[in-house]
Regions:
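Symmetry-related core transmembrane helices of the 12-TM Major Facilitator Superfamily/SLC fold
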Residues: 188-205
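Residue-level signature of mid-helix packing/kink "hotspots" within the transmembrane helices
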Residues: 79-87, 170-171, 175
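Hydrophobic core of transmembrane alpha-helices in multi-pass small-molecule transporters
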Residues: 44, 113-117, 123-141, 147
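Helix-loop boundary and gating motifs at the non-cytosolic
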Residues: 28-82
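Helix-breaking motifs and short loop linkers at transmembrane-helix boundaries and internal kinks
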Residues: 97, 119-124, 207
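Helix-to-loop junctions at the C-terminal end of transmembrane segments
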Residues: 84-98, 181-182
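Structural signature of the two symmetry-related core transmembrane helices
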Residues: 101-115
């Protein structure tokens, strides 16, 4: 940048040689882009599946022949695993050289364990399946929240616009699955939920922690 004078009038002039350096400096100090679509798609899939599970799963268990006592035990596993799964999973991930791998493992276990529910099962099989499924499903969200926040240093106002897609997915499924299941039967619930868990795994596969910026 030069300062030149002409008849007492001074102005700043930028030479072409300085432009590359100014551009490089701007790139160094500009924050990396936020992968909003990838982050939003995970929230959408996770809470869309939750929108199917929360109101309709007990009805599915009743359809499978479970009585009220059995349903209460099976549904309690969802809340019991919420106590231990997040802490256990995030601790394992934090000690791993590649913590993102554990998010993907958790989503794969969620999909695989849930897929077993399309098979005919008695109480013992349903109990074992629910333990594994609920543990994996409850484990992944706290880790994903950490991933989301790693992309938002100094830009926390963007969190709400990303997280809202979880609420949208939940509302769409809760409202849409009711009439759909009335028409095709509650027995189809696992088949309707499987694509949502597949979407969850796909989103985890393309998501990672933000890279550290020097």
């Amino acid at each position: 940048v030069r300062v030149s004078g002409d008849g007492g009038n001074y102005r700043n002039t930028t030479t072409s040689a300085t432009l590359p350096f100014m551009s490089a400096a701007a790139e160094i100090h500009s924050p990396p882009p936020i992968p909003a679509f990838r982050l939003s798609s995970f929230y959408f899939a996770y809470y869309a599946a939750l929108g199917a599970f929360t109101p309709y799963w007990a009805l599915f268990l009743k359809h499978r022949g479970m009585d009220v006592a059995a349903i209460s035990i099976l549904m309690s596993l969802w809340y019991a695993t919420r106590i231990i799964a997040p802490t256990t999973w995030t601790t394992i991930a934090a000690r791993s050289p590649r913590p993102i791998r554990w998010l993907r493992i958790g989503c794969a276990l969620t999909l695989a364990s849930f897929a077993a529910f399309v098979l005919p099962m008695q109480f013992t099989g349903l109990f074992a399946g629910m333990v594994l499924f609920c543990f994996a499903y409850n484990a992944v969200m706290p880790q994903f929240e950490a991933i989301t926040l790693s992309h938002l240093p100094g830009r926390s106002e963007r969190y709400g616009r990303i997280r809202v897609w979880g609420s949208i997915g939940f509302i769409l499924v809760v409202a849409g699955f009711g009439p759909l299941l009335d028409g095709i039967g509650i027995g189809a619930l696992p088949w309707l939920m499987l694509p949502l868990f597949l979407m969850l795994l796909g989103s985890a596969a393309i998501t990672d922690y933000a890279r550290a910026v020097d």
